Design a protein with these regions (language model features):
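Alpha/beta-hydrolase-fold catalytic nucleophile elbow
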Residues: 155, 213, 238-239
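Glycine-rich nucleophile elbow surrounding the catalytic serine of serine-hydrolase chemistry
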Residues: 214-226
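N-terminal targeting or regulatory segments adjacent to alpha/beta-hydrolase or S9 domains
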Residues: 1-84
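Mobile cap/lid helix-loop segments that gate and shape the active-site cleft of serine hydrolases
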Residues: 178-179, 187, 232-262
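Alpha-helix C-terminal capping segments
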Residues: 227-231
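Alpha/beta-hydrolase fold nucleophile elbow
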Residues: 204-216
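Glycine-rich active-site/cofactor-binding loop and its immediate structural neighborhood
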Residues: 74-132
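Cap/lid segment of the alpha/beta-hydrolase catalytic domain
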Residues: 109-110, 114-196, 201, 246-250
Length: 262
């Protein structure tokens, strides 16, 4: 072949392709905003259909239902004046243990349950002040305990590996799950919901009064659980309440790119 050109000769065409992709995405965002706004016009009519649609967007394992009530395995860590502290595991899926800290109040047998959800780089031990300081969590779990409710602080795939060990790659996990029709957000939402199923079965828990409180990424999961789980009656989302019109670039690049938004 005799025709030769400079390696930048087709840059204008490449730029056109790139810019076209960006325009397409922006147009889809505009359409999605209109669709989201329309979904609120008849709220709460059709809430079950909307909840099923949200699960379908997120993918497996939310699309397969919840099944029976899983067993809670408890290991006693401490007996404090007002509560007993356990490290617990729930088999959220076959062969997959999901762990957390469970603070059971002493005294009156039946009480509400509040989930205390840590954020990015956190652990239940950190947000619950077991490490001596709760840093930016401002004693979150301990403050929830002062309400008189039982508190459950679970671990999601977000801990700081330099501080807490056990390396992982959340983005790779999410990519592999998407190959299977799911997402890491769907998996962890399912784990949290299965934990609620398990803990609701305890004699001391009032299954009609379950709430969620989370900081940062935990706040994101708090909002998600409020949408997905009819057992969640109240939610506090700290530093994560967004309608997606606020700093969309940061949202996509730093946090919730694992989730499909529509």
């Amino acid at each position: 072949m005799r025709y030769i050109e400079n390696h930048m000769e087709a840059a204008l065409w490449r730029q056109g392709y790139r810019d076209g992709i960006e325009r397409l995405i922006e147009e889809r965002y505009k359409q999605a905003r209109v669709e989201r706004s329309a979904q609120w016009t008849d709220f709460p009519t059709g809430i079950d259909e909307k909840r099923a649609f949200a699960k379908e967007i997120l993918g497996w394992p939310l699309t397969e239902g919840r099944g029976g009530v899983p067993e809670v395995k408890k290991e006693l860590l401490a007996e404090e004046e007002n509560f007993s502290l356990y490290r617990t595991t729930v088999e959220a899926l076959p062969g997959m243990p999901f762990y957390g800290l469970l603070f059971l109040q002493k005294g009156t047998p039946v009480r509400p349950l509040i989930l205390s959800l840590h954020g990015k780089e956190g652990t239940p031990e950190l947000c619950s002040s077991l490490l001596g300081s709760s840093t930016n969590y401002n004693e979150m779990t301990q403050r929830l305990l002062k309400t008189g409710a039982h508190v459950y602080a679970p671990q999601t795939l977000l801990w700081n590996t330099d501080m807490f060990g056990v390396p992982y790659n959340r983005e790779r996990v999410d990519a592999r799950l998407k190959h299977l029709g799911g997402s890491v957000v769907a998996l962890e939402a399912h784990c949290l919901m299965r934990s609620i199923d398990a803990l609701s079965g305890l004699d001391c828990v009032d299954a009609e009064n379950i709430g969620v409180c989370g900081l940062s990424y935990g706040g994101f999961y708090s909002l998600l659980l409020a949408a997905l789980d009819p057992w969640v009656r109240s939610t506090v989302a700290c530093a994560r309440f967004t309608d997606l019109d606020f700093d969309i670039g940061r949202i996509v690049n730093e946090g919730d790119a694992q989730i499909s938004w529509k």
